[in-house]
Amino acid sequence: MALAGPSRLLALAVRLLLEPRRNLVVRGSDQSLPVVRVPRALQRRQEQRQSGRGSLQRPVLVRPGPLLVSARRPELNQPARLTLGRWERAPLASRGWKHRRSRQDHFSIERVQQEAPALRNLSSRGSFVDLGLEPRVLLALQEAVPEVVQPTSVQSKTIPPLLRGRHLLCAAETGSGKTLSYLLPLFQRLLRGSDLDSRSFTAPRGLVLVPSRELAEQVQAVAQSLGGYLGLQVIELGGGLGMSRLKLQLYRRPAADVLVATPGALWKALKSQLISLQHLNFIVLDEVDTLLDESFLELVDYILEKSPIAESPAELEDPFNPKAQLVLVGATFPEGLNQLLSKVTSPDSLTTITSSKLHCLMPHVRQTFMRLKGADKVTELVQILKQQDKASKTEPSGTVLVFCNSASTVNWLGYILDDHKIQHLRLQGQMPASMRAGIFQSFQKGSQNILVCTDIASRGLDSVHVEVVINYDFPPTLQDYIHRAGRVGRVGSEVPGSVISFVTHPWDVSLVQKIELAARRRRSLPGLASSVGDPLPQKA
């Protein structure tokens, strides 16, 4: 029994030796065994990946001519005549920008037309006379703004319904002439109203609400230049004042037909019963997408509650109890509009006017995106500003706007530019009112060619002399990018504009990829489209 185990093992070994060998290749003495340097499984995966990549790539016919997108790597260029299909894969130049090795990469969305979309086909839109404006209003327009000869597309769509007394929402690209589109018809309505001698600063007949004191100064200047020829008085009420100074300012101002105010200053005046809105003929919310932000929403809500807004156009002509016409103007569709309208009027009474290029990238402005390390942004900025200054000495050039995301960055960057002997102005919301007063007007008049600012200068401010916008900090949202880029390429701009954006963080790259994809597909920017519909249910 003890020998049974070893005998079995010996029998098994003999049987294995005597069986024929299978799958064995007899090699000669001169043949060597293959050396496996890459595991077969990994090698098969690489072969499958390469074969799959080759099957997805299709030859693209590159046509001669201008480019829509020009990248550092020529294979990622896209001709202006090429349009990608809806389901066709877009070769993004910014696809790998979240990796740190992508630094120093760049691409540009090129200028594909020379004029602003609002100025195209002006001859086919008729004249201001055809829109229903009276001769005295046309004469005031000719004297105040002689360079405006024909209406833009936005003005052609906006003026007739305003003259008919309709509540209006106008959403159009920046720099398309929206200010004149509401001032002209509303001034004409004021002239048809009560006697001008009954004006009172404490009870204006028109109100224009804007988000910043700089925009209030600008709108007041444009409105007063028109109103001066019509016998109308326009007064501006800016923020940043204490109650005592606000009262003093109100008492010193002459009687007014139209008040241009910021939400904070008007809220203080209404709370103190220094101003009444019961005699309003119209109320305009300019840059309404900004006014409906959380920082302004409560103030704007209170102001609208104090305003007698009409339910229908018939109430505007009531001689005993006239109501106000509501006008909303902005460069993007505002969020939260349904909730706001449900408190003051029905959304069905609102006529919506939108432009064909709403939420689209401007086709007449070159936009460059540079992937940079955070520490390299200052060096790149100084180099661009010095090149711009050198070019301005040899040929006519415009001014430069440098946008930052915070007031502290504006101050810090200002000190850096001072060290490099680069003259500039600074504008940010934390400045005292006395320091902020007149800074943007000085920049518009050309006292300095460079303005370092926050988004306070990106909403509505007219900047026809600006040639370059530099996003030192990439804007946090696509709405902010639209507003910043809209400081160039405006109606009446004297120089072709360009935008340069520094891209640093991964969340910046995500927005850049959305912008590039929209440009390559020739579509509007995602996430901005909206509409005005039924009001949302109010909370009990």
Curated annotation (Swiss-Prot):
One of its GO terms (cellular component) is nucleolus. A motif (Nuclear export signal) lies at residues 180-191. Its main location: nucleus. A motif (DEAD) lies at residues 286-289. The keyword Cell cycle does not apply. Its EC number is 3.6.4.13. InterPro entries: DEAD/DEAH_box_helicase_dom, Helicase_ATP-bd, Helicase_C-like, P-loop_NTPase, RNA_helicase_DEAD_Q_motif. GO terms for biological process: mitochondrial large ribosomal subunit assembly. Pfam families: DEAD (PF00270), Helicase_C (PF00271). It is an enzyme of class 3 (hydrolase). It is found in: Nucleus; Mitochondrion; Mitochondrion matrix, Mitochondrion nucleoid; Mitochondrion matrix. A motif (Mitochondrial targeting signal) lies at residues 3-18. A motif (Q motif) lies at residues 126-156. It catalyses: ATP + H2O = ADP + phosphate + H(+). GO terms for molecular function: ATP binding; ATP hydrolysis activity; RNA helicase activity; rRNA binding. The keyword Nucleotide-binding applies. PROSITE patterns: HELICASE_ATP_BIND_1, HELICASE_CTER, Q_MOTIF. Residues 377-536 form the Helicase C-terminal domain. ATP binds at A172, E173, T174, G175, S176, G177, K178, T179. Monomer. Found in a complex with GRSF1, DHX30, FASTKD2 and FASTKD5. Associates with the 16S mitochondrial rRNA (16S mt-rRNA) and with the mitochondrial ribosome large subunit (39S). Plays an essential role in facilitating the proper assembly of the mitochondrial large ribosomal subunit and its helicase activity is essential for this function. May be involved in RNA processing or transport. Has RNA and Mg(2+)-dependent ATPase activity. Belongs to the DEAD box helicase family. This is Probable ATP-dependent RNA helicase DDX28. The lineage of its organism: Eukaryota, Metazoa, Chordata, Craniata, Vertebrata. The gene is Ddx28.
